């Protein structure tokens, strides 16, 4: 009486191990590089906060000239944030005339940059 043997051959097992190795070699660099994605997201978050602060300030000052702050340079927007600009971030200086809209650049740690829109108000 012959017994039926079942299972994987050595070649099948080696092929599976090789395939797992190739997949790991492709996937691991993506997980290692998540730091740059996090820095870009942080800079974009700061830029979003700056854009919101600039828009709220513009609306408040248009409604009542005694409220809000004068914005005639991109760097003035940093003063509109509660607590100021986070440590390690800086805004590139760019003049803004009254009622003009410009695109400003904020630079974060490791030279990560993001842009935001600001409108000048006097």
What are these regions (language model features)?
Residues 20, 36-42, 74-82:
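Short alpha-helical interface patches
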Residues 45-53:
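Short extracytoplasmic/periplasmic juxtamembrane "stem" segments immediately C-terminal to an N-terminal membrane anchor
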Residues 52-122:
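Periplasmic/extracellular, small/polar-rich flexible segments of pilin-like filament-forming proteins
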Residues 8-11, 15, 25, 43, ...:
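Low-complexity, intrinsically disordered short peptide segments enriched in small/polar/basic residues
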Residues 1-2, 29, 60, 66:
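Short, intrinsically disordered low-complexity segments
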Residues 4-5, 32-46, 61:
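Aliphatic-rich helix starts adjacent to a transmembrane/signal segment
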Residues 2-31, 35:
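N-terminal single-pass transmembrane signal-anchor helix
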